[in-house]
A protein has these predicted regions:
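Hydrophobic alpha-helical membrane-insertion segments
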Residues: 124-140
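Conserved small/polar residues in nucleotide/adenosyl-binding loops
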Residues: 159-161
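Membrane-interface helix termini and inter-helical loops of multi-pass transporters
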Residues: 9-19, 84-86, 147-154
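Membrane-interface helix-boundary motifs at transmembrane edges
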Residues: 48-60, 114-121
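Alpha-helical transmembrane segments of multi-pass membrane proteins
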Residues: 1-11
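Membrane-interface helix-loop-helix modules in multi-pass inner-membrane proteins
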Residues: 67-112
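Hydrophobic cores of alpha-helical transmembrane segments in multi-pass inner/ER membrane proteins
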Residues: 28-42, 99-111
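Transmembrane alpha-helix entry/boundary detector in multi-pass membrane proteins
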Residues: 19-30, 58-63, 83-99
Length: 161
């Protein structure tokens, strides 16, 4: 989107097209993270007090977070094609984000495969918690331990033992 809409960039600063990425790609990931945190909280609430309302909130926040994640991947691929020459470079953060989203897609498949509503809600809440705990290593921890094209991805070379 930022490549289709003319977003003004500061003159004389070598950021060029990178600055536009901050208006679309980065907010998608922050939105995804916030929505997954809220979904995680409602999954815990459901397990503590099994109200269908908590399950519905947990599911819908996860769905919306997944939409933001997919949009983050798409906008990142557009930007990567422009900046790095390839939409998918196999970067650790790209791969981690794709794996994390696949884990959440499996959450929706799991919920869709169960017929008993109570069982669907309970198993879904447990899996949602699992998915949340897989999300942060996949997109925040592991990419920082390896070389990455993304900012902050210098890997273990920054750690001096």
């Amino acid at each position: 989107m930022g490549f289709l809409i003319k977003v003004p960039t500061p003159r004389g600063v070598p950021l060029q097209e990178s600055i536009r990425n901050l208006f679309f790609h980065v907010p998608m990931w922050f939105g995804m993270n916030i929505l997954f945190i809220v979904s995680f909280i409602y999954a815990i609430k459901y397990l503590r007090s099994p109200k269908q309302e908590y399950d519905a909130y947990s599911l819908e926040f996860a769905r919306t977070g997944t939409v933001f994640g997919v949009l983050g991947l798409i906008t990142g691929a557009i930007w990567a094609k422009y900046q790095w020459g390839a939409a998918w470079s196999g970067d650790a953060k790209q791969n981690g984000a794709a794996i994390a989203l696949l884990i959440y897609f499996a959450y929706f498949v799991l919920r869709g495969s169960l017929n008993d509503e109570e069982k669907k809600s309970r198993i879904g809440a447990v899996y949602n918690i699992f998915a949340f705990f897989m999300l942060y290593p996949a997109i925040w921890i592991l990419p920082r331990l390896t070389e990455s094209l993304h900012p902050g991805g210098q890997g273990l070379s920054l750690i001096h033992i």
